[in-house]
């Protein structure tokens, strides 16, 4: 969550609003392709693993059958993104956009949902801290001027891919390999599609706004908007982290029909979200004038 506070002022001064805007625009387009590659897997996979986490055989079958669709959908998304690069991408953005294909590829390797479903948060948090720290150091070391935009894009994309690959080294501790079975795998598609609808709705205002800014205005405007949104996302990340933690816990309790605990956790979560979001909103408003010059 604090990465933008450390990195954004430096990147803004080295790459300028133009460079930040190009990164924001190209990343948003690649991110929408990656979103299709996941097709609701983050939420559905998290919930499915949590419901059967006490049975190693069942959770192994669930994991490999869900990941099978993740591969198929990611390959489809990469094909669509390749068509965008060939026929629709502006020549001036093609180099950066080509590097961003790693962002789409990341959706194939992303198995955070499996560890979240098992409530193994320590592993993912430790991985994030180490990889993000290396990414920050790499940016400071290799990004020195505006022409280094492609290096910045490569570092950010590779850091995510490396983080996902690190998690794969731990899969054997929690899962046994099971060949995906069509009869079992096909039942996931309708449920994935249902969960994909709200994800698409959220992505409309999270990603399309930057794409529209870059298309209808100059890239500098997209760059200014990107930095503002990064600051807003810092406190918002604390709120969304609660959902990431509570989803597997609630799914597990539902599978065990622990109604009392479900109601208790729901009430406490709502109280936390309302009070903390109000405090953070007023806090941002209070320091906005002092923060703006740095970003």
Label each PLM-derived region with a short phrase:
Residues 1-42, 136, 193-216:
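Signature of the first transmembrane helix
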Residues 15-26, 52-65, 75-105, 145-153, ...:
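Membrane-interface helix-capping segments at transmembrane helix termini in multi-pass transporters
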Residues 45, 111-122, 137, 141-144, ...:
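C-terminal transmembrane helix end/exit motif
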Residues 2, 37, 64-99, 165, ...:
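Alpha-helical transmembrane segments of multi-pass membrane transport and lipid-handling proteins
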Residues 122-125, 149-156, 165-206, 245, ...:
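Interhelical loop/hinge segments that connect adjacent transmembrane helices in multipass membrane
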Residues 9, 38-54, 228, 232-270, ...:
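Helix-loop junctions and terminal segments of transmembrane helices
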Residues 2-9, 80-81, 126-149, 162, ...:
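Alpha-helical transmembrane segments of multi-pass membrane transporters
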């Amino acid at each position: 969550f604090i990465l933008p506070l450390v990195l954004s002022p430096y990147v803004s001064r080295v790459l300028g609003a133009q460079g930040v805007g190009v990164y924001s625009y190209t990343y948003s387009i690649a991110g929408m392709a990656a979103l299709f590659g996941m097709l609701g897997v983050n939420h559905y996979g998290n919930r499915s693993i949590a419901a059967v986490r006490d049975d190693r055989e069942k959770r192994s079958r669930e994991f490999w059958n869900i990941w099978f669709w993740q591969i198929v959908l990611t390959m489809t998304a990469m094909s669509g993104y390749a068509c965008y690069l060939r026929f629709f991408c502006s020549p001036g953005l093609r180099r950066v956009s080509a590097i961003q294909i790693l962002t789409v590829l990341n959706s194939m390797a992303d198995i955070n949902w499996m560890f979240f479903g098992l409530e193994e948060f320590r592993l993912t948090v430790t991985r994030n801290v180490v990889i993000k720290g290396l990414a920050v150091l790499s940016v400071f070391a290799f990004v020195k001027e505006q022409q280094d935009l492609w290096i910045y894009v490569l570092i950010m994309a590779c850091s995510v891919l490396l983080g996902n690959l690190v998690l794969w080294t731990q899969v054997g501790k929690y899962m046994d390999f099971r060949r995906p079975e069509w009869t079992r795998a096909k039942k996931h598609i309708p449920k994935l599609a249902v969960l994909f609808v709200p994800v698409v709705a959220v992505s409309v205002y999270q990603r399309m706004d930057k794409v529209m800014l870059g298309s209808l205005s100059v890239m500098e405007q997209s760059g200014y908007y990107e930095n503002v949104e990064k600051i807003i996302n810092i406190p918002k990340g604390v709120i969304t982290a609660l959902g990431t933690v509570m989803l597997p816990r609630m799914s597990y309790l539902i599978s065990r029909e622990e109604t009392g605990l479900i109601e208790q956790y729901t009430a406490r979560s709502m109280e936390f979200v309302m009070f903390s979001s109000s405090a953070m909103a007023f806090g941002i408003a209070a320091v906005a004038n002092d923060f703006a010059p740095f970003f």
